[in-house]
């Protein structure tokens, strides 16, 4: 689910923190990708002309494998070295959110049974898509045969992606979930695994610029995310993105915000959930269950051609001609991928206080100019 309204806050208040780029801009970069999120996208988006999922003659779904194979190839073609991270056991606090998802699925199943029009049926069917253990296992087998590394996270995949990025094993974490920022990844890439046909640029969010532009510490930013509503606990009823940011700037922490609301000074406009586990939720962001990135060795190896043909073509009935063509692209891309970026030859020096202040000032100016532009009317010549 991610964090409600966080993207809109960043877009409005710190637009300079989001850079929209073509995939070619990430040539030479290593990226840790949220595998479960990607597989979910593939199961929904990779479809036959009639709208059904791709499958073998015996009914085995193959949309996830088709998506994984060709989207990974696209990254390799553009000089990106992907590493996929799979979810482990969800935190106990997430059980409430998972229960809500189960209830929504049951409701959707009822609507599907009652649906009469084909378009309506298709809409409900897509909402019922779920990544299974079998989907994950098949994707891991495919990646292993392709020579693409993957990591089995002990907990949340986004947290492990952020850990790899923080420790410099990869450049960025890639996920659609905005809560990845709360795990302190230096960069978050969104839309990386989208279909090329969608022509959607990749959104690169710089966490440091976000914090500077919002004038929040990382701890306050995490508290803001929890207040907006995350997978670990409910939000404060009646508090939307605008109010949440205002309260965080005025009070500085969830403890003080809760104290302010419960004191009655807010005229009972908002209600804090009973036994609200915001401190436990905060702990999951600050100290997530991850493998230390220094213990992980990411290796990209040559694809196992014969085994890939056997798996994709003979077992999953993919076109052998297309798979062989894909393998050649994979071999070429992984071979040429050793060429690094120019900035890889230089030591990264931490930004000075003056540089950070300049970045924050630039973000404020961009916000001011954006507001001014909205009020202007362009005359026709």
Curated annotation (Swiss-Prot):
Keywords per UniProt: DNA damage, DNA repair, DNA replication, Endonuclease, Exonuclease, Hydrolase, Magnesium, Metal-binding, Mitochondrion, Nuclease, Nucleus, Phosphoprotein
EC number: 3.1.-.-
Post-translational modification, as annotated: Phosphorylated. Phosphorylation upon DNA damage induces relocalization to the nuclear plasma.
Residues holding Mg(2+) 2: 177, 179, 231
Cofactor(s) the record lists: Mg(2+)
Listed SUPFAM superfamilies: 5' to 3' exonuclease, C-terminal subdomain (SSF47807), PIN domain-like (SSF88723)
UniProt region (I-domain), positions on chain: 120-251
First-level EC class: hydrolase
Major site of localization recorded for this protein: nucleus
Subcellular location field: Nucleus, Nucleolus; Nucleus, Nucleoplasm; Mitochondrion
Gene Ontology CC: cytosol; mitochondrion; nucleolus; nucleoplasm
Keyword match DNA damage: yes
Residue numbers binding DNA: 47, 71, 156, 229, 231
One example GO MF annotation: 5'-3' exonuclease activity
Disulfide bond positions: none
InterPro entries: 5-3_exonuclease_C_sf, Flap_endonuc, HhH2, PIN-like_dom_sf, XPG-I_dom, XPG/Rad2, XPG_CS, XPG_DNA_repair_N
Keyword Nuclease: yes
Stated role: Structure-specific nuclease with 5'-flap endonuclease and 5'-3' exonuclease activities involved in DNA replication and repair. During DNA replication, cleaves the 5'-overhanging flap structure that is generated by displacement synthesis when DNA polymerase encounters the 5'-end of a downstream Okazaki fragment. It enters the flap from the 5'-end and then tracks to cleave the flap base, leaving a nick for ligation. Also involved in the long patch base excision repair (LP-BER) pathway, by cleaving within the apurinic/apyrimidinic (AP) site-terminated flap.
Family: Belongs to the XPG/RAD2 endonuclease family. FEN1 subfamily.
Assembly, per entry: Interacts with PCNA. Three molecules of FEN1 bind to one PCNA trimer with each molecule binding to one PCNA monomer. PCNA stimulates the nuclease activity without altering cleavage specificity.
Name used for this protein in its record: Flap endonuclease 1
